[in-house]
Protein backbone atom coordinates (compact mmCIF):
# COMPACT_ATOMS: atom_id res chain seq x y z
CA UNK A 1 0.00 0.00 0.00
CA UNK A 2 1.25 3.50 -0.83
CA UNK A 3 0.24 6.89 0.55
CA UNK A 4 -2.42 7.58 -2.06
CA UNK A 5 -4.18 4.23 -1.62
CA UNK A 6 -4.19 4.79 2.15
CA UNK A 7 -5.66 8.26 1.65
CA UNK A 8 -8.49 6.71 -0.35
CA UNK A 9 -9.25 4.57 2.70
CA UNK A 10 -9.40 7.71 4.83
CA UNK A 11 -11.55 9.67 2.39
CA UNK A 12 -13.94 6.75 1.85
CA UNK A 13 -15.30 7.27 5.34
CA UNK A 14 -15.54 3.54 5.96
CA UNK A 15 -13.18 3.79 8.92
CA UNK A 16 -11.67 6.53 11.06
CA UNK A 17 -7.96 7.30 10.98
CA UNK A 18 -7.70 5.92 14.49
CA UNK A 19 -9.26 2.63 13.37
CA UNK A 20 -6.98 2.41 10.33
CA UNK A 21 -3.91 3.08 12.45
CA UNK A 22 -4.98 0.48 15.00
CA UNK A 23 -5.07 -2.06 12.16
CA UNK A 24 -1.33 -1.44 11.75
CA UNK A 25 -0.80 -2.04 15.47
CA UNK A 26 -2.71 -5.33 15.23
CA UNK A 27 -0.45 -6.41 12.38
CA UNK A 28 2.64 -5.30 14.31
CA UNK A 29 1.50 -7.27 17.36
CA UNK A 30 1.19 -10.36 15.15
CA UNK A 31 4.35 -10.03 13.06
CA UNK A 32 6.89 -8.17 15.17
CA UNK A 33 7.72 -11.20 17.35
CA UNK A 34 8.86 -12.90 14.14
CA UNK A 35 10.56 -9.92 12.46
CA UNK A 36 11.72 -7.83 15.45
CA UNK A 37 11.52 -4.60 13.46
CA UNK A 38 10.26 -2.40 16.32
CA UNK A 39 12.05 -1.73 19.60
CA UNK A 40 9.04 0.06 21.09
CA UNK A 41 5.54 1.12 20.07
CA UNK A 42 3.98 4.54 20.71
CA UNK A 43 0.30 3.62 20.79
CA UNK A 44 -0.78 6.48 23.08
CA UNK A 45 0.95 9.06 20.90
CA UNK A 46 -0.47 7.50 17.74
CA UNK A 47 -4.00 7.44 19.17
CA UNK A 48 -3.77 11.10 20.15
CA UNK A 49 -2.42 12.09 16.72
CA UNK A 50 -5.11 10.01 14.98
CA UNK A 51 -7.89 11.59 17.02
CA UNK A 52 -6.65 15.05 16.02
CA UNK A 53 -6.88 14.11 12.33
CA UNK A 54 -10.33 12.59 12.83
CA UNK A 55 -11.51 15.86 14.41
CA UNK A 56 -10.32 17.78 11.35
CA UNK A 57 -12.24 15.38 9.10
CA UNK A 58 -15.38 15.65 11.24
CA UNK A 59 -15.22 19.45 11.09
CA UNK A 60 -14.56 19.44 7.32
CA UNK A 61 -11.26 21.24 7.84
CA UNK A 62 -8.32 21.11 5.46
CA UNK A 63 -6.03 18.17 6.17
CA UNK A 64 -2.24 18.57 6.39
CA UNK A 65 -0.22 16.84 3.67
CA UNK A 66 0.69 13.69 5.64
CA UNK A 67 -2.60 13.39 7.53
CA UNK A 68 -2.98 9.89 8.94
CA UNK A 69 0.15 8.38 7.31
CA UNK A 70 1.62 5.75 9.72
CA UNK A 71 5.37 6.30 10.08
CA UNK A 72 8.13 4.52 12.03
CA UNK A 73 11.29 6.21 13.30
CA UNK A 74 14.75 4.66 13.55
CA UNK A 75 15.75 4.44 17.20
CA UNK A 76 18.75 6.75 16.88
CA UNK A 77 16.48 9.71 16.09
CA UNK A 78 15.16 11.55 19.14
CA UNK A 79 11.43 11.51 19.85
CA UNK A 80 10.29 13.57 22.83
CA UNK A 81 9.17 11.53 25.81
CA UNK A 82 10.03 8.23 24.13
CA UNK A 83 13.04 5.97 24.68
CA UNK A 84 15.77 6.65 22.11
CA UNK A 85 18.23 3.83 22.68
CA UNK A 86 20.40 3.51 19.56
CA UNK A 87 19.78 -0.21 20.21
CA UNK A 88 22.55 -0.04 22.79
CA UNK A 89 22.81 -1.03 26.43
CA UNK A 90 24.45 2.37 26.91
CA UNK A 91 21.20 4.23 26.11
CA UNK A 92 18.64 1.50 26.69
CA UNK A 93 16.70 3.63 29.21
CA UNK A 94 17.38 7.09 27.75
CA UNK A 95 14.17 9.07 27.22
CA UNK A 96 14.72 11.99 24.88
CA UNK A 97 13.69 15.39 26.31
CA UNK A 98 13.20 16.86 22.83
CA UNK A 99 11.98 16.02 19.32
CA UNK A 100 14.30 15.83 16.32
CA UNK A 101 13.70 18.41 13.61
CA UNK A 102 12.93 15.76 10.99
CA UNK A 103 10.37 13.82 13.03
CA UNK A 104 8.85 17.04 14.37
CA UNK A 105 8.12 18.16 10.80
CA UNK A 106 6.39 14.86 10.07
CA UNK A 107 4.08 15.15 13.09
CA UNK A 108 3.30 18.80 12.30
CA UNK A 109 2.13 17.66 8.85
CA UNK A 110 -0.21 15.05 10.29
CA UNK A 111 2.02 11.97 10.25
CA UNK A 112 1.28 9.26 12.84
CA UNK A 113 4.15 7.92 14.98
CA UNK A 114 3.84 4.13 15.29
CA UNK A 115 7.08 3.54 17.17
CA UNK A 116 10.86 3.19 17.03
CA UNK A 117 12.68 0.69 14.83
CA UNK A 118 15.63 -1.58 15.47
CA UNK A 119 19.15 -0.86 14.21
CA UNK A 120 22.74 -1.94 14.56
CA UNK A 121 24.10 -0.49 17.80
CA UNK A 122 24.75 3.23 17.31
CA UNK A 123 24.10 2.62 13.58
CA UNK A 124 27.41 0.76 13.25
CA UNK A 125 26.78 -2.30 11.12
CA UNK A 126 25.33 -3.72 7.93
CA UNK A 127 23.01 -6.44 9.26
CA UNK A 128 21.13 -5.21 12.37
CA UNK A 129 22.80 -8.04 14.27
CA UNK A 130 24.60 -5.85 16.82
CA UNK A 131 21.40 -4.53 18.45
CA UNK A 132 20.92 -5.08 22.17
CA UNK A 133 17.30 -5.98 21.28
CA UNK A 134 18.36 -8.86 19.03
CA UNK A 135 18.57 -9.30 15.28
CA UNK A 136 15.85 -8.09 12.93
CA UNK A 137 14.69 -10.65 10.34
CA UNK A 138 14.32 -10.04 6.62
CA UNK A 139 10.62 -10.32 5.66
CA UNK A 140 11.59 -12.16 2.45
CA UNK A 141 13.39 -14.88 4.43
CA UNK A 142 13.40 -14.70 8.22
CA UNK A 143 16.66 -16.67 8.33
CA UNK A 144 18.42 -13.77 6.62
CA UNK A 145 19.39 -10.28 7.72
CA UNK A 146 17.49 -7.18 6.57
CA UNK A 147 20.71 -5.22 6.11
CA UNK A 148 21.75 -2.34 8.28
CA UNK A 149 22.03 -0.24 10.05
CA UNK A 150 18.42 0.82 9.32
CA UNK A 151 17.31 -2.82 9.16
CA UNK A 152 14.29 -2.34 11.38
CA UNK A 153 13.07 0.58 9.28
CA UNK A 154 13.43 -1.32 5.99
CA UNK A 155 11.89 -4.51 7.38
CA UNK A 156 8.91 -2.64 8.83
CA UNK A 157 8.12 -1.07 5.44
CA UNK A 158 8.64 -4.33 3.52
CA UNK A 159 6.40 -6.27 5.92
CA UNK A 160 3.62 -3.68 5.79
CA UNK A 161 4.08 -2.65 9.43
CA UNK A 162 4.09 1.04 8.44
CA UNK A 163 3.77 3.04 5.23
CA UNK A 164 7.08 4.87 5.65
CA UNK A 165 10.05 4.78 7.97
CA UNK A 166 12.79 7.28 8.68
CA UNK A 167 16.36 6.02 8.75
CA UNK A 168 19.86 7.42 8.81
CA UNK A 169 22.59 6.81 6.25
CA UNK A 170 26.27 7.16 7.16
CA UNK A 171 27.76 4.71 4.67
CA UNK A 172 24.71 3.08 3.09
CA UNK A 173 22.49 2.45 6.10
CA UNK A 174 19.29 3.44 4.27
CA UNK A 175 20.12 2.14 0.81
CA UNK A 176 21.65 -1.24 1.70
CA UNK A 177 18.71 -2.47 3.84
CA UNK A 178 16.28 -1.04 1.27
CA UNK A 179 18.02 -3.22 -1.33
CA UNK A 180 17.96 -6.32 0.90
CA UNK A 181 14.27 -5.82 1.74
CA UNK A 182 13.03 -4.83 -1.72
CA UNK A 183 11.87 -1.30 -0.88
CA UNK A 184 12.85 2.26 -1.81
CA UNK A 185 15.56 4.00 0.24
CA UNK A 186 16.74 7.57 -0.31
CA UNK A 187 19.88 9.19 1.07
CA UNK A 188 19.64 12.97 0.50
CA UNK A 189 22.47 15.42 -0.18
CA UNK A 190 24.49 16.08 2.98
CA UNK A 191 22.80 19.05 4.64
CA UNK A 192 19.51 18.76 2.77
CA UNK A 193 17.79 17.41 5.92
CA UNK A 194 18.53 18.65 9.42
CA UNK A 195 20.51 16.29 11.67
CA UNK A 196 19.21 17.98 14.83
CA UNK A 197 18.09 15.13 17.06
CA UNK A 198 19.99 12.42 15.18
CA UNK A 199 22.37 10.81 17.66
CA UNK A 200 25.74 11.24 15.98
CA UNK A 201 27.85 8.41 14.57
CA UNK A 202 30.08 10.20 12.03
CA UNK A 203 29.00 13.82 11.78
CA UNK A 204 30.44 14.60 8.34
CA UNK A 205 28.70 11.56 6.84
CA UNK A 206 25.37 11.11 8.70
CA UNK A 207 22.16 12.00 6.87
CA UNK A 208 18.48 11.34 7.61
CA UNK A 209 16.25 10.01 4.84
CA UNK A 210 13.09 8.01 4.03
CA UNK A 211 12.39 4.34 3.36
CA UNK A 212 9.08 3.72 1.56
CA UNK A 213 7.21 1.37 -0.75
CA UNK A 214 7.26 3.72 -3.74
CA UNK A 215 9.40 6.48 -5.20
CA UNK A 216 6.56 9.00 -5.00
CA UNK A 217 6.15 8.31 -1.27
CA UNK A 218 9.90 8.85 -0.77
CA UNK A 219 9.65 12.13 -2.67
CA UNK A 220 6.80 13.28 -0.45
CA UNK A 221 8.62 12.44 2.78
CA UNK A 222 11.81 14.10 1.55
CA UNK A 223 9.91 17.29 0.71
CA UNK A 224 8.34 17.21 4.18
CA UNK A 225 11.59 16.93 6.15
CA UNK A 226 13.95 19.04 4.01
CA UNK A 227 14.93 22.66 4.49
CA UNK A 228 17.00 25.07 6.54
CA UNK A 229 17.19 24.52 10.28
CA UNK A 230 18.91 27.01 12.58
CA UNK A 231 19.51 24.20 15.06
CA UNK A 232 21.89 22.45 12.63
CA UNK A 233 24.75 24.56 11.28
CA UNK A 234 25.44 22.02 8.52
CA UNK A 235 21.87 22.24 7.19
CA UNK A 236 21.78 23.94 3.78
CA UNK A 237 19.92 27.21 3.31
CA UNK A 238 18.65 26.31 -0.15
CA UNK A 239 15.11 26.33 -1.59
CA UNK A 240 13.32 22.98 -1.39
CA UNK A 241 11.69 22.05 -4.71
CA UNK A 242 8.43 20.14 -4.92
CA UNK A 243 9.92 16.72 -5.60
CA UNK A 244 6.55 15.38 -6.75
CA UNK A 245 6.22 17.83 -9.65
CA UNK A 246 8.87 16.28 -11.93
CA UNK A 247 8.33 12.60 -11.10
CA UNK A 248 6.52 11.74 -14.33
CA UNK A 249 8.75 13.79 -16.62
CA UNK A 250 10.12 11.82 -19.60
CA UNK A 251 13.69 10.60 -19.20
CA UNK A 252 14.26 10.58 -22.95
CA UNK A 253 17.72 11.99 -23.60
CA UNK A 254 18.82 11.91 -19.97
CA UNK A 255 22.42 10.69 -19.66
CA UNK A 256 22.95 7.78 -17.29
CA UNK A 257 26.53 6.83 -16.47
CA UNK A 258 27.44 3.23 -15.67
CA UNK A 259 30.39 3.24 -13.26
CA UNK A 260 32.71 0.61 -14.75
CA UNK A 261 34.65 -0.04 -11.53
CA UNK A 262 31.48 -1.26 -9.81
CA UNK A 263 30.72 -3.92 -12.39
CA UNK A 264 34.33 -5.15 -12.62
CA UNK A 265 34.70 -5.82 -8.89
CA UNK A 266 35.37 -9.52 -8.07
CA UNK A 267 33.01 -9.37 -5.08
CA UNK A 268 29.96 -8.57 -7.22
CA UNK A 269 27.49 -11.48 -7.32
CA UNK A 270 26.87 -12.54 -10.96
CA UNK A 271 23.10 -12.60 -10.41
CA UNK A 272 23.17 -9.04 -9.06
CA UNK A 273 25.29 -7.92 -11.99
CA UNK A 274 22.98 -9.56 -14.52
CA UNK A 275 19.84 -8.03 -12.97
CA UNK A 276 21.27 -4.51 -12.82
CA UNK A 277 22.64 -4.66 -16.38
CA UNK A 278 19.22 -5.88 -17.53
CA UNK A 279 17.76 -2.79 -15.86
CA UNK A 280 20.26 -0.64 -17.76
CA UNK A 281 18.74 -1.94 -20.99
CA UNK A 282 15.30 -1.09 -19.65
CA UNK A 283 16.47 2.49 -19.11
CA UNK A 284 17.80 2.52 -22.66
CA UNK A 285 14.41 1.40 -23.96
CA UNK A 286 12.81 4.25 -22.01
CA UNK A 287 14.90 6.75 -23.97
CA UNK A 288 17.86 7.31 -21.68
CA UNK A 289 21.36 7.61 -23.11
CA UNK A 290 23.73 5.09 -21.53
CA UNK A 291 27.42 5.98 -21.09
CA UNK A 292 30.31 4.05 -19.54
CA UNK A 293 31.99 6.18 -16.88
CA UNK A 294 35.25 5.70 -15.01
CA UNK A 295 35.60 6.68 -11.34
CA UNK A 296 39.16 5.46 -10.71
CA UNK A 297 39.05 5.86 -6.93
CA UNK A 298 35.50 4.55 -6.38
CA UNK A 299 36.71 1.26 -4.92
CA UNK A 300 39.04 3.13 -2.54
CA UNK A 301 35.94 4.45 -0.81
CA UNK A 302 35.53 1.50 1.55
CA UNK A 303 39.06 1.81 3.01
CA UNK A 304 38.72 5.58 3.23
CA UNK A 305 35.37 5.34 4.97
CA UNK A 306 36.57 2.83 7.55
CA UNK A 307 39.23 5.29 8.66
CA UNK A 308 37.17 8.50 8.69
CA UNK A 309 33.95 7.10 10.17
CA UNK A 310 35.60 5.38 13.18
CA UNK A 311 37.67 8.51 13.84
CA UNK A 312 34.53 10.63 14.04
CA UNK A 313 32.72 7.94 16.02
CA UNK A 314 35.48 7.77 18.63
CA UNK A 315 35.09 11.51 19.22
CA UNK A 316 31.27 11.49 19.21
CA UNK A 317 30.99 8.52 21.56
CA UNK A 318 33.48 9.93 24.07
CA UNK A 319 30.53 11.67 25.78
CA UNK A 320 29.09 8.37 27.03
CA UNK A 321 30.90 7.96 30.32
CA UNK A 322 28.14 7.00 32.75
CA UNK A 323 28.34 10.32 34.58
CA UNK A 324 25.55 12.49 33.16
CA UNK A 325 23.43 9.92 31.28
CA UNK A 326 23.63 6.48 29.80
CA UNK A 327 24.52 3.14 31.37
CA UNK A 328 26.50 3.38 34.60
CA UNK A 329 28.45 0.54 36.18
CA UNK A 330 27.82 0.32 39.92
CA UNK A 331 30.13 -0.45 42.83
CA UNK A 332 33.36 0.98 41.43
CA UNK A 333 35.81 2.57 43.87
CA UNK A 334 36.77 5.64 41.84
CA UNK A 335 35.61 7.79 38.92
CA UNK A 336 38.10 6.49 36.33
CA UNK A 337 37.26 2.87 37.10
CA UNK A 338 33.53 3.65 36.87
CA UNK A 339 33.93 5.33 33.46
CA UNK A 340 36.07 2.50 32.08
CA UNK A 341 33.67 -0.22 33.25
CA UNK A 342 30.60 1.71 32.12
CA UNK A 343 31.98 1.99 28.59
CA UNK A 344 33.25 -1.60 28.54
CA UNK A 345 29.87 -2.95 29.66
CA UNK A 346 27.65 -0.41 27.89
CA UNK A 347 29.10 -0.69 24.38
CA UNK A 348 28.97 -3.86 22.27
CA UNK A 349 31.90 -5.44 20.45
CA UNK A 350 31.45 -3.66 17.11
CA UNK A 351 31.12 -0.22 18.69
CA UNK A 352 34.20 -0.85 20.83
CA UNK A 353 36.09 -2.05 17.75
CA UNK A 354 35.33 1.16 15.86
CA UNK A 355 36.19 3.36 18.85
CA UNK A 356 39.56 1.61 19.10
CA UNK A 357 40.23 1.97 15.36
CA UNK A 358 39.29 5.64 15.44
CA UNK A 359 41.29 6.44 18.55
CA UNK A 360 44.35 4.73 17.07
CA UNK A 361 44.02 6.51 13.72
CA UNK A 362 43.77 9.89 15.46
CA UNK A 363 46.61 9.29 17.91
CA UNK A 364 49.84 11.25 17.80
CA UNK A 365 52.20 9.86 15.20
CA UNK A 366 49.46 8.08 13.23
CA UNK A 367 46.95 10.76 12.22
CA UNK A 368 49.03 11.80 9.19
CA UNK A 369 49.34 8.22 7.97
CA UNK A 370 45.66 7.38 8.43
CA UNK A 371 43.12 10.14 9.10
CA UNK A 372 44.67 12.97 7.11
CA UNK A 373 45.55 10.66 4.23
CA UNK A 374 41.98 9.33 4.20
CA UNK A 375 40.66 12.89 4.00
CA UNK A 376 42.88 13.55 0.98
CA UNK A 377 41.56 10.42 -0.74
CA UNK A 378 38.04 11.57 0.12
CA UNK A 379 38.71 14.77 -1.83
CA UNK A 380 39.93 12.73 -4.80
CA UNK A 381 36.78 10.56 -4.72
CA UNK A 382 34.65 13.71 -4.78
CA UNK A 383 36.75 14.97 -7.71
CA UNK A 384 36.02 11.75 -9.62
CA UNK A 385 32.30 12.32 -9.12
CA UNK A 386 32.62 15.94 -10.27
CA UNK A 387 34.32 14.78 -13.45
CA UNK A 388 31.64 12.14 -14.02
CA UNK A 389 28.83 14.68 -13.68
CA UNK A 390 30.48 16.84 -16.31
CA UNK A 391 29.59 14.03 -18.73
CA UNK A 392 26.31 12.55 -17.43
CA UNK A 393 23.22 13.51 -15.41
CA UNK A 394 22.88 10.44 -13.19
CA UNK A 395 25.20 7.59 -12.19
CA UNK A 396 24.06 3.97 -11.83
CA UNK A 397 25.48 1.07 -9.81
CA UNK A 398 24.18 -1.98 -7.97
CA UNK A 399 23.25 -0.96 -4.43
CA UNK A 400 25.00 -3.96 -2.87
CA UNK A 401 27.43 -6.59 -4.17
CA UNK A 402 25.11 -9.38 -2.97
CA UNK A 403 21.56 -10.08 -1.87
CA UNK A 404 20.68 -10.57 1.82
CA UNK A 405 22.99 -13.01 3.57
CA UNK A 406 22.16 -15.50 6.31
CA UNK A 407 22.17 -14.45 9.94
CA UNK A 408 25.53 -15.16 11.54
CA UNK A 409 27.45 -15.40 8.26
CA UNK A 410 29.74 -12.46 9.02
CA UNK A 411 29.30 -11.83 12.75
CA UNK A 412 32.85 -13.02 13.40
CA UNK A 413 34.24 -11.65 10.13
CA UNK A 414 33.91 -7.85 10.32
CA UNK A 415 36.01 -7.21 7.22
CA UNK A 416 33.63 -9.25 5.04
CA UNK A 417 30.69 -7.45 6.68
CA UNK A 418 32.24 -4.08 5.82
CA UNK A 419 32.40 -5.03 2.13
CA UNK A 420 28.60 -5.00 2.02
CA UNK A 421 28.94 -1.19 1.94
CA UNK A 422 31.40 -1.24 -0.96
CA UNK A 423 29.08 0.48 -3.44
CA UNK A 424 27.37 2.91 -1.09
CA UNK A 425 30.10 4.56 1.01
CA UNK A 426 31.64 6.68 -1.80
CA UNK A 427 28.33 8.56 -2.04
CA UNK A 428 28.51 9.56 1.64
CA UNK A 429 32.15 10.57 1.34
CA UNK A 430 31.17 12.93 -1.49
CA UNK A 431 27.98 14.16 0.21
CA UNK A 432 25.82 13.25 -2.78
CA UNK A 433 22.17 12.12 -2.98
CA UNK A 434 21.40 8.52 -3.98
CA UNK A 435 18.39 6.23 -4.10
CA UNK A 436 18.05 2.44 -4.04
CA UNK A 437 15.11 0.90 -5.89
CA UNK A 438 14.21 -2.77 -6.45
CA UNK A 439 15.18 -4.07 -9.90
CA UNK A 440 14.81 -7.85 -9.68
CA UNK A 441 15.30 -11.05 -7.69
CA UNK A 442 17.97 -13.71 -7.48
CA UNK A 443 17.27 -17.44 -7.85
CA UNK A 444 16.46 -17.68 -4.13
CA UNK A 445 13.71 -15.07 -4.56
CA UNK A 446 15.67 -12.37 -2.71
CA UNK A 447 15.39 -8.72 -3.83
CA UNK A 448 18.13 -6.98 -5.80
CA UNK A 449 18.50 -3.20 -5.70
CA UNK A 450 20.05 -0.71 -8.09
CA UNK A 451 21.46 2.62 -6.99
CA UNK A 452 21.00 5.94 -8.78
CA UNK A 453 23.41 8.70 -7.74
CA UNK A 454 22.81 12.39 -8.39
CA UNK A 455 24.88 15.53 -8.20
CA UNK A 456 24.59 17.80 -5.16
CA UNK A 457 20.96 18.85 -4.48
CA UNK A 458 19.70 16.98 -7.55
CA UNK A 459 17.35 14.67 -5.68
CA UNK A 460 14.60 15.69 -8.11
CA UNK A 461 16.55 14.13 -10.97
CA UNK A 462 17.22 10.74 -9.39
CA UNK A 463 13.63 10.62 -8.13
CA UNK A 464 12.38 11.28 -11.66
CA UNK A 465 14.56 8.54 -13.18
CA UNK A 466 13.66 6.11 -10.38
CA UNK A 467 9.94 6.81 -10.72
CA UNK A 468 9.90 6.20 -14.48
CA UNK A 469 11.71 2.88 -13.92
CA UNK A 470 9.30 1.95 -11.12
CA UNK A 471 6.26 2.50 -13.33
CA UNK A 472 7.80 0.35 -16.07
CA UNK A 473 9.08 -2.49 -13.86
CA UNK A 474 6.63 -5.03 -12.43
CA UNK A 475 9.16 -6.02 -9.74
CA UNK A 476 8.04 -3.05 -7.64
CA UNK A 477 4.61 -4.66 -7.16
CA UNK A 478 6.00 -7.87 -5.65
CA UNK A 479 5.90 -8.05 -1.84
CA UNK A 480 7.06 -10.68 0.67
CA UNK A 481 4.54 -13.26 1.84
CA UNK A 482 4.63 -13.07 5.62
CA UNK A 483 2.34 -15.40 7.54
CA UNK A 484 0.52 -13.86 10.48
UniProtKB/Swiss-Prot annotation:
Organism encoding this protein: Prochlorococcus marinus subsp. pastoris (strain CCMP1986 / NIES-2087 / MED4)
Quaternary assembly: Heterotrimer of A, B and C subunits.
Entries under PROSITE patterns matching the protein: AMIDASES
Cellular component, GO annotation: glutamyl-tRNA(Gln) amidotransferase complex
The protein's role, per its UniProt record: Allows the formation of correctly charged Gln-tRNA(Gln) through the transamidation of misacylated Glu-tRNA(Gln) in organisms which lack glutaminyl-tRNA synthetase. The reaction takes place in the presence of glutamine and ATP through an activated gamma-phospho-Glu-tRNA(Gln).
Protein name: Glutamyl-tRNA(Gln) amidotransferase subunit A
Catalytic residues in the record: 74 (charge relay system), 149 (charge relay system), 173 (acyl-ester intermediate)
Keyword Protein biosynthesis applies: yes
Amino acid sequence: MNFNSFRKEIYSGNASVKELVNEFFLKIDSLNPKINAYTCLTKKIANSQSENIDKLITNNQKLPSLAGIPIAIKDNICTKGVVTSCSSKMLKDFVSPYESSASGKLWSLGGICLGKTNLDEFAMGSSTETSVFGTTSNPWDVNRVPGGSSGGSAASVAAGLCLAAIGSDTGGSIRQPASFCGVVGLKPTYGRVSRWGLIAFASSLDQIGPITNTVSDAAEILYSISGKDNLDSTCLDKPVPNYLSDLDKSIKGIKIGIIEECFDHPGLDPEVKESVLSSVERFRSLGAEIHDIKCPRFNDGIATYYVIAPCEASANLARYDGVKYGYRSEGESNLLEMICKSRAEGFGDEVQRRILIGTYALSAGYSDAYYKKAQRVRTLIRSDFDNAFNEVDVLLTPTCPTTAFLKGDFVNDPLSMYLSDLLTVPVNLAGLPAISIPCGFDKKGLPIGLQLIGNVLEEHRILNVANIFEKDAEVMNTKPNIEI
